[in-house]
Amino acid sequence: MSEAAAVKFRVFTLNCWGIRYLSKCCRERYEMIVQLLSQERHDVVLLQEVWSEKDYHFLRSKLTNTHPYSVYFRSGAIGSGLCVFARYIITDSFLYRYSLNGYPYKLHAEYCREKDYYLPHRLLQAWELGQFIRHTGKTADVVVLGGDLNMHPCDLGNRLLQCYTGMKDSFLETEQFEGCEGGCTLLSQNCFASVGDTQSFPSGIRIDYVLYKGSRGFSVKCEHLMTTNGTPPGRNMPYSDHEAVCATLSVQKDENVVSEQRHVEKTDPQLVDILNEARAELKIGIHGAEKVRYSSGRMAILGFILLLLEVVMAIIPLVTTTPENSFPKVSFYILGMVAFAVALLAGILYVFHTIEVKMLQGTEDQMSNAIQALQERLGH
């Protein structure tokens, strides 16, 4: 084993909840975040929900001395809300959009845990994220994933992501922890947190993570993990509705770990079980999306028929000797607009759910192929 000195690498992640004019005390909280980052001087800072470019420019101007390098990921009409600050040069950056929903900045939120309609969406996104990590991380010495993943530690999507990629959870692996009980990052006592999110979890929820893995002869371990704990001393409000997470990673060159890091090539029976479970959930999602697509299609046809009847009623007086249509004109126009709106909206929904079905089916096929490949290796 190489005796090269270990390199300390500090990663900070925070969902800033920075919806300008809607989120409470945005500017005051950004000033608190700037002060924290300037004092702690993390190597890499990963911020989410910085929705306004003005807020990003404010952060960049204040962090010039401690974090001179940064990138703001622009996407769509409202942006991605993602930005990265670093003490070292950022040589390259890339924004990947999930194929379903098109969000580049998050896995789909869990709006109702009991009736989670978006579970198949999050599984698809976790699968795509896992594939992205596998394909882009092959030439990297160290891979780090940080942010709000909108998944509990034991959720299927989280298990799929970690088992498929070999990423390690810094909270579970750390040698020393300091912060909220259980590493929770969404606390009921946080004055900015939504009551609905934490009502079923009075002790809090852990949905913000720093995941990591080494490769190409580098071993990585988490020496220290820290979370903020509500309102900091001397302040009258927390940094955000989420708690920040800071991981101190120790990276050391070690040629003996090459075979251990090739997680992709391991024939893991647990991964087969997780993929089968994920496929079952995707099939449920496909069935639900097909039902909604069918209903949308019927509604679009109904709207089109009503619109066609309107056209016929308008043409009849022009081509016959029948007296002018006695149907009230105002009601006639209103009915026409309603029919057009129903046909248009239902048609858009039909197209959207058709895309949803195809994306879910494609992911289910990919998982099926992965299971077959794993089972073949297990059989040999």
Which sequence ranges carry the predicted segments?
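Active-site beta-strand/loop signature of hydrolases that rely on acidic residues for catalysis
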Residues: 10-17, 29, 33-59, 85, ...
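Conserved beta-strand segments of alpha/beta enzyme cores
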Residues: 10, 68-69, 89-92, 166-169, ...
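Structured beta-strand-rich core segments of catalytic domains in phosphoester-bond hydrolases
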Residues: 3-5, 16, 25-26, 37-38, ...
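Generic structural signal for helix capping and beta-alpha/helix-loop junctions
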Residues: 21, 54, 102, 153, ...
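Binuclear metal-dependent hydrolase catalytic cores centered on His/Asp/Glu-rich metal-binding motifs
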Residues: 106, 119-123
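Metal-dependent phosphoester-hydrolase catalytic domains
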Residues: 120, 131-144, 150-380
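Conserved SAM-binding loop and adjacent beta-strand
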Residues: 24-26, 122, 344
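N-terminal signal-anchor transmembrane helix
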Residues: 1-11, 16, 21, 26-30, ...
